[in-house]
């Protein structure tokens, strides 16, 4: 049967996708619902902690029971999105306000960016990347806070 995959090919493809973190095993509905509130509370704590520099860089999925590794800026973008901000420019502005409140700035090529315009430009670029790449994973894994 040309064009059909056998079990070994399917298993190999799934193994590869899982190894690349492009696929995840999911829990049954009862387990997902049981874990949802605890995951939400943990994720809220992590995103709040990221405001102050945080030490935990993972959000937990109730769907898979697994963690999604994220840097501080991505955690702050996720927090802004999960709080209802829908546009990358809003996330960038939100993160910039947080960084400013701590006297921090973005780094680019190992150098601190000077001024609001340069920092917002970099944050907007990163927010667009987050929207194109990471946000899909957050939604698919039902990560919320």
What residues fall within each predicted segment?
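Long, charge-rich, low-complexity alpha-helical segments
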Residues: 1-145
